[in-house]
Amino acid sequence: MEIRVFHQEDFEEVITLWERCDLLRPWNDPEMDIERKMNHDVSLFLVAEVNGEVVGTVMGGYDGHRGSAYYLGVHPEFRGRGIANALLNRLEKKLIARGCPKIQINVPEDNDMVLGMYERLGYEHADVLSLGKRLIEDEEY
């Protein structure tokens, strides 16, 4: 397995992977999310590749105060092999190299399988409520 920065050639393969991982939501346009990330620090957008196939992704960010991780997904046929752990580990190292003191990940409360994985990796439940506001409307995907 190789973990590397996203390349433009990965575009369609990544969107297909996100569909298989059930990461897409009607209110997010994945094509726009990728375009925006490519225009703003693509070095924190990582893919895991096995035999030339993209089998995992994580999209990271850093605002100078905290890091974040989005679009963490692993192809169903490749789960249980440590790919998600490796992607997060690489992202964390990149954030630490930038002086990032902490990372935040938003997870649906009912996603017990993923919550357990994050807890095993040292993530803790933060007693905060995540609020959001759409600033630019995307087309429904």
Swiss-Prot record:
This is Acetyltransferase YpeA. It holds the Pfam family Acetyltransf_1. Belongs to the acetyltransferase family. YpeA subfamily. It comes from Escherichia coli O6:K15:H31 (strain 536 / UPEC). Transmembrane segments: none annotated. It comes from the Bacteria. The keyword Protease does not apply. CDD domains: NAT_SF. GO terms for molecular function: acyltransferase activity, transferring groups other than amino-acyl groups. It is an enzyme of class 2 (transferase). Residues 1-141 form the N-acetyltransferase domain. Keywords: Acyltransferase, Transferase. Its EC number is 2.3.1.-.
